[in-house]
């Protein structure tokens, strides 16, 4: 309302006049605005009628006489007759403000109206104005005194607040600007010695607060976190550097120090006794430990999942695990010395051997974060000709499982491990194709019942020859990384590893497609048929007496 209807009449004055009557209570804020608008309309009507009288008399300035005549002529202005009679004529004494000869007519008319209103109630208005001014100053005084801008100490209405309020009241009550300046200077002069008063309990908490506010910097220095040092922690984490040397992990099936990056270690030798061949795959005459598929190639151990056992043969117990784990286990009970393969699986004739414990040839994937010298390796499993093999002890691959507790004279096509005898197998692999598939393999099982051993010269388990970079894996304790093209003889001079400069994310290792010629799945030649191999084995039958097996 105030912004929309701007008036020149003071709202406080109108409100004060309205509240002179005792019956009038509170007044709404819109009421003085409406009254000011009524006053404007009334003044405009009065001026227009007075202007007509002035024009009739051929005058240019509206005078008091013109107003008197207008009020006397118009019946609507009868309530103003008493006021007009008190106003003297222009020729007589002039009371009130002097007239302005210059300016617009509207400005002169407003001045005349104000004179007209003030003349009738001069005495009462002067008293009312004094009262209004004092009230307004009292309302503004506590606001300014509370801030303590002129009173001194205490922004919350303390000791200096009352002084400041009193000083501001004195300043406003006095009208001369010179006195205002003097009072300001006197108050400031009186408040200057107040900052160091006598010790009081009221002032002590403020002093304590002032001292306590000086210590946030020390607290911030304590709470700030220390700078992260690259030596203390690393966002990328610790770098896993594989151990380059794994010296003689004796008969360890778990191999916590395996080279997980696919590196063949210098001291991880392919021995007949204790040394582990690491890449998460222990390829020993003692342990062939595949940690990914739990397929163990063991000559001495019967306690691994999915054992790749060349007839685990002990002094007291012969554990063949026949017909316990999988419907597709081969119950090869051989009572003859010819090592006949009596298979109960109809899929064993042409499909050959399934590798590892899966429906197809499983692969062992190596970590691809740092080094990729080696790739997935496919390992042979003897006499397991069906698929859908899981890693939960489903494949117990035993060749020629004999059910005899007296094991001294049994002839098994595989690794015989009697704790009191030395039995070895010669497995010669010839490489022909670039796919690392060994298509020709001969196992000459010449067995002697007197010493329970196989001739080591012709049938020694000497070497696995990979076609990857002409590297040979031998059973001796030497490793020559500087001679990748070393072709070893039957005795073997060391393990020559594939080059580590492979940049492929998944390089491939050669896969053993077959260990005995019976199990070759990649070659459909009639030379590799079961009957042909059995005939060859019959022709090379050792001179051992037949025994009856229970």
UniProtKB/Swiss-Prot annotation:
Family as reported in the entry's similarity comment: Belongs to the NC2 alpha/DRAP1 family.
GO molecular function: core promoter sequence-specific DNA binding; protein heterodimerization activity; RNA polymerase II general transcription initiation factor activity
A GO cellular component annotation in the UniProt record: nucleus
Function per UniProt: Involved in transcriptional regulation. Component of the NC2 complex which represses RNA polymerase II transcription through binding to tbp and thereby inhibiting the assembly of the preinitiation complex.
GO BP of this protein: transcription by RNA polymerase II
Name of the protein described by the UniProt record: Dr1-associated corepressor homolog
Cell compartments where the protein resides: Nucleus
Keyword annotations from UniProtKB, A to Z: DNA-binding, Nucleus, Repressor, Transcription, Transcription regulation
Gene designation per UniProt: drap1
Originating species: Dictyostelium discoideum
Histone-fold domain ranges (all copies): 7-71
Compositional bias of kind Basic and acidic residues: 89-103
Protein's UniProt keywords contain Nucleus: yes
């Amino acid at each position: 309302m105030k912004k929309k209807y701007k008036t020149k009449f003071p709202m406080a004055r109108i409100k004060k006049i309205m509240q002179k009557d005792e019956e009038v209570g509170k007044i709404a804020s819109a009421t003085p605005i409406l009254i000011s608008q009524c006053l404007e309309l009334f003044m405009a009507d009065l001026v227009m009628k007075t202007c007509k009288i002035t024009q009739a008399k051929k005058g240019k300035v509206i005078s008091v006489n013109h107003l008197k005549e207008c009020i006397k002529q118009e019946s609507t202005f009868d309530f103003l007759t008493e006021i007009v009679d008190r106003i003297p004529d222009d020729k007589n004494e002039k009371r009130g403000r002097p007239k302005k000869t210059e300016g617009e007519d509207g400005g002169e008319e407003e001045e005349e109206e104000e004179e007209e209103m003030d003349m009738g109630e001069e005495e009462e208005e002067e008293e009312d104005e004094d009262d209004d001014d004092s009230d307004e100053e009292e309302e503004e005084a506590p606001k300014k005194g509370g801030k303590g801008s002129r009173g001194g100490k205490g922004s919350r209405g303390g000791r200096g607040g009352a002084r400041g309020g009193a000083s501001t009241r004195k300043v406003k009550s006095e009208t001369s600007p010179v006195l205002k300046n003097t009072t300001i200077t006197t108050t400031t002069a009186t408040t200057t010695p107040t900052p160091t008063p006598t010790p009081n309990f009221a002032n002590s908490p403020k002093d304590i607060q002032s001292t306590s506010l000086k210590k946030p910097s020390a607290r911030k220095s304590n709470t700030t976190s220390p700078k992260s040092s690259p030596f203390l922690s690393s966002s990328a984490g610790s770098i896993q550097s594989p151990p380059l040397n794994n010296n003689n992990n004796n008969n360890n099936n778990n191999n916590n120090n395996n080279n997980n990056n696919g590196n063949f270690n210098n001291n991880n030798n392919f021995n007949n006794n204790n040394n582990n061949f690491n890449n998460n795959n222990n390829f020993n005459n003692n342990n062939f430990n595949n940690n990914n598929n739990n397929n163990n190639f063991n000559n001495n151990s019967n306690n691994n999942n999915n054992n790749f056992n060349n007839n685990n043969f002990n002094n007291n117990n012969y554990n063949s695990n026949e017909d316990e784990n999988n419907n597709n286990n081969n119950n090869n009970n051989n009572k003859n010395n010819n090592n006949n393969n009596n298979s109960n699986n109809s899929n064993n004739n042409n499909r050959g051997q399934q590798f590892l414990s899966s429906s197809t040839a499983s692969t062992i994937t190596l970590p691809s974060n740092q080094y990729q010298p080696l790739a997935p390796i496919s390992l042979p499993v003897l006499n397991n000709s069906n698929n859908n093999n899981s890693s939960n002890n489903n494949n117990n691959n035993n060749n020629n499982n004999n059910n005899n507790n007296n094991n001294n004279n049994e002839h098994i096509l595989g690794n015989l491990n009697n704790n009191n005898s030395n039995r070895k197998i010669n497995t010669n692999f010839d490489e022909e194709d670039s796919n690392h598939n060994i298509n020709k393999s001969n196992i000459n099982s010449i067995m002697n019942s007197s010493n329970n051993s196989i001739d080591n010269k012709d049938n020694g388990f000497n070497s696995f020859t990979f076609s990857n970079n002409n590297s040979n894996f031998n059973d001796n304790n030497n490793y020559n990384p500087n001679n990748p093209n070393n072709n070893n003889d039957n005795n073997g001079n060391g393990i020559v590893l594939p080059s580590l400069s492979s940049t492929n994310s998944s390089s491939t290792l050669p896969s053993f497609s077959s260990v005995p010629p019976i199990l070759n799945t990649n070659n459909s030649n009639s030379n590799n048929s079961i009957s042909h191999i059995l005939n060859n084995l019959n022709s090379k039958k050792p001179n051992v007496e037949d025994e009856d097996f229970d």
